[in-house]
Design a protein with these regions (language model features):
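Beta-rich carbohydrate-recognition modules and glycan-binding surfaces
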Residues: 1-179
Length: 179
């Protein structure tokens, strides 16, 4: 497991490749029979390059999510994020609430994650999401930052029109890792 670099994606690489060398992907509830529909795009929004998630989240057929997902290591392995305090995102959206989901190598089932909500306003805003405030969802596992594997920007849990963009996502803090 290698130590996590500060920058996850600053939108400088050729789309849909992130700064960490992996590719953003769109995941929807259709993988489990839902009917939500969405699109991922790379575009310039209010003067900034961004990756954007747009679509209709539907609760039909036990669905209810659209997600921009990104593995944190190109080999699918985990990174060690213990030296960081949390995640910082530059976000833009339609004044709706979204989630950032974390997955670790301890998580096996697709519905398990660690979650933190944020609001995406119609102006570029920087949000700080401290790891200490992420809550486990349908898992008994602790959030082990030395096993961080994947992040997801998620529109979830209610029927609505999703429109959220990320211009920068990185770790913040930078203390020393625990022994």
């Amino acid at each position: 497991v290698r130590e996590a670099a500060e920058v996850i994606d600053d939108l400088r690489a050729e789309p849909p490749v992130a700064a960490v060398g992996t590719r953003w992907s769109l995941v929807s509830d259709r993988v489990m029979g839902g009917v939500s529909s969405g699109a991922m795009s790379r575009e310039r929004i209010a003067g900034r390059d961004a990756i954007r998630l747009q679509g209709a989240v539907s609760l039909e057929n036990n669905g209810g999510f659209l997600q921009l997902a990104l593995d944190l290591a190109s080999d699918g392995e985990a990174v060690d994020a213990r030296r960081w305090t949390g995640l910082r995102l530059d976000v833009f959206g339609n004044d709706q609430d979204y989630n950032l989901h974390l997955r670790t190598s301890d998580i096996r089932r697709p519905w398990e994650s660690f979650r933190h909500a944020f609001r995406a306003t119609p102006d570029w805003t920087t949000v700080l999401l401290p790891f200490a405030e992420f809550t486990p969802h349908r898992t008994d596992q602790p959030l082990r930052l030395e096993r961080l594997r994947r992040i997801g920007v998620v529109a979830i849990g209610r029927a609505f029109e999703a429109d959220v963009a990320i211009a920068d996502i990185r770790f913040y803090g930078g203390g020393r890792p625990e022994a």
